[in-house]
């Protein structure tokens, strides 16, 4: 869904066109941010190990990408709908947000997740 950044009031919406889905979407811009919704059955198809680091611990940061990349890959454009309506306020003033408090871990985790093998598109959901 779309969200508004506090305090700038900038509205952020997914920017996904037909060509976005060509190739490996993990290597493209991150568009599946806050307020992603999905079917439980799709979520259950994501391998548990893809939510974890090499030590078997769940990701401390960047879990949104660990969740959304595989589901977007499996669902494809036929089962994706961007919501332009603002549904979320993203508080950029929060000093505890991961990109402020744990930025290096966030960037490292993102690279690991982006380099994982993409999931295959499902025929049916």
Please provide the spans of the model-predicted regions.
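Short, flexible, basic/aromatic active-site loop/helix in glycosyltransferases
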Residues: 11-29, 40, 44
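Short helix/loop segment immediately N-terminal to the Walker
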Residues: 48-59
